[in-house]
Amino acid sequence: MIQMQTVLEVADNSGARKVMCIKVLGGSHRRYARVGDVIKVGVKDAIPRSKVKKGAVMRAVVVRTAQGVRRDDGSLIRFDDNAAVLLNNQNEPIGTRIFGPVTRELRERFMKIISLAAEVL
């Protein structure tokens, strides 16, 4: 469950390390984002000479949450961290590699992230 001021890890090679959620997109007063939701983030930490600079405001999709994802069969998939993948304005990932596992719930809207990920749960 991601809300404003939540700090997330970045799960791609765009150059950002940590981002902070500044807005949950998709509704006028939407409070929480789950896996697969698009959020607006500010870059808090980035590696030098990368595609993304510290202070940049970007879009991101949530790929892992510590709260987890409840499946239709009743199973719950939880992760150790909250992580996101940075997107451009066309909702395509900026990075060319995805680190760590992602969930099947991204398949409908973000097939490119599924194909780049090493492990899909």
From Swiss-Prot:
CDD domains xrefs: Ribosomal_uL14
Gene: rplN
Membership in a protein family: Belongs to the universal ribosomal protein uL14 family.
Keywords: Ribonucleoprotein, Ribosomal protein, RNA-binding, rRNA-binding
GO molecular function: large ribosomal subunit rRNA binding; structural constituent of ribosome
Gene3D superfamilies: Ribosomal protein L14
GO BP terms in the entry: translation
Purpose of the protein: Binds to 23S rRNA. Forms part of two intersubunit bridges in the 70S ribosome.
Protein name per UniProt: Large ribosomal subunit protein uL14
Subunit text: Part of the 50S ribosomal subunit. Forms a cluster with proteins L3 and L19. In the 70S ribosome, L14 and L19 interact and together make contacts with the 16S rRNA in bridges B5 and B8.
Annotated PROSITE patterns: RIBOSOMAL_L14 (PS00049)
Organism, as annotated: Legionella pneumophila (strain Corby)
Gene Ontology cellular component terms for the protein in this record: cytosolic large ribosomal subunit
InterPro entries registered for this protein in UniProt: Ribosomal_uL14, Ribosomal_uL14_bac-type, Ribosomal_uL14_CS, Ribosomal_uL14_sf
Lineage of producing organism: Bacteria, Pseudomonadati, Pseudomonadota, Gammaproteobacteria, Legionellales
